[in-house]
Amino acid sequence: MVLETLNPLHYNITSLVPDTMPVATVPILILMCFLFLIWNHEETSSIPGPGYCMGIGPLISHGRFLWMGVGNACNYYNKTYGDFVRVWISGEETFIISKSSSVSHVMKHWHYVSRFGSKLGLQCIGMYENGIIFNNNPAHWKEIRPFFTKALSGPGLVRMIAICVESTTEHLDRLQEVTTELGNINALNLMRRIMLDTSNKLFLGVPLDENAIVLKIQNYFDAWQALLLKPDIFFKISWLCKKYKDAVKDLKGAMEILIEQKRQKLSTVEKLDEHMDFASQLIFAQNRGDLTAENVNQCVLEMMIAAPDTLSVTLFFMLILIAEHPTVEEEMMREIETVVGDRDIQSDDMPNLKIVENFIYESMRYQPVVDLIMRKALQDDVIDGYPVKKGTNIILNIGRMHKLEFFPKPNEFSLENFEKNVPSRYFQPFGFGPRSCVGKFIAMVMMKAILVTLLRRCRVQTMKGRGLNNIQKNNDLSMHPIERQPLLEMVFTPRRNANENQGDGMDQH
């Protein structure tokens, strides 16, 4: 009887469906369930990070890099998801890492020596499979690197000390060239001029227009930073990338002229030994057929922009920190007077300037300029338990790493952070391993020589309310102050113990 009662209900159930759910809704529900399953599948990734979300996730993450800049985006993702994060750039899986053990693993292994970036962007700036900085062809990079290694070490490293002293002194004597209408010093421009001059004297050795080349380098860097991660469609819209292409062409053209001057000079000198610098070695390698003219031009360009691009900003930030921390300045000056005295700094002084060295390290930790390293996995791997597929992009967020582990006062500027020996895995401003910064040793020599020479001559001061935290910065490919702001100006005052001929160039300031 019960079954008989239920049977009519069974037979008539379909007649009730239209009243409660339209038939057209059923396929939509099925599709939604299918998409929900896909969504859930993507969310089960063992690596923290934003979800794939039917392809929306990769678009959003790439868009965030373009909108915020590489450095800011990396900090956002690490802060939000942890020290090992999966995102996407140009649809490619990308890991952002700020954990010291993972960072060390990547740096020390050869299968992470390749770089990544937009092929069209790198082609536009001349770095695609060329030069050394972003050359993503490991075989060709290995052929090019020895030219840089030779120029940046050995006799060249020792010569650079005297060159830095000479250049710093000359530029301090010509401070009027970087003095504003209010009588203040454009310290960043001063550092850029010194860096370009020292690079030219050691690596190229031809007359050049400092001011013009510095401006061309700034524009080239802006193009490099803007184009590195742009999607391919950007390059199909000519008016969008015209100004960047023009900036690249401008610097390349200037460098080609300077290199041609070098060729002419080499063809007329009697003793080649006296003129065998970095550019000469490249030119002769081209003559032997080992390099192309394009290789030579790009390598010289990269050698000439490296210091004005990064070291100049690093030194500028250091001058601001010195002005903000007078007790640190006093410690440094006491050491300089003890170690160097009244003479110019020499190579033997370098290892004895411990306080100056700790100041440089702490400045680079607290206010880094290059705070990330970009690599690509050339084979499958596992990093701290996370699977890494061949072709995965890797961004090492070393700037964040330097403020998360080991240091007693990670969020403060304090020389106490380097009072004790710091294990290398916790502090890597230049990286290490097969693709570490090729100029890391000469960079330390240059910074010491320039700081000592400058501080012996004058005291540096910031304008009231214009400290490091007040300066607007752009954290993209590297950390740079936003140009054309009065906060970049400083006051240089001659020291009392400077002799008269040293002080003349700065009396008006």
UniProtKB/Swiss-Prot annotation:
Q: Where in the cell is it found?
A: Membrane
Report how it sits in the membrane: Peripheral membrane protein
Pfam families (UniProt xref)? p450
List ligand-binding residues for heme.
437
Sorted alphabetically, the keyword list is:
Heme, Iron, Lipid metabolism, Membrane, Metal-binding, Monooxygenase, Oxidoreductase
GO terms of biological process kind: brain development; cellular response to estradiol stimulus; estrogen biosynthetic process; female gonad development; memory; negative regulation of testosterone secretion; positive regulation of cell population proliferation; positive regulation of estradiol secretion
Q: Which family does it belong to?
A: Belongs to the cytochrome P450 family.
Protein name, entry field = Aromatase
- Which species does this protein come from? Taeniopygia guttata
- What gene does this protein come from? CYP19A1
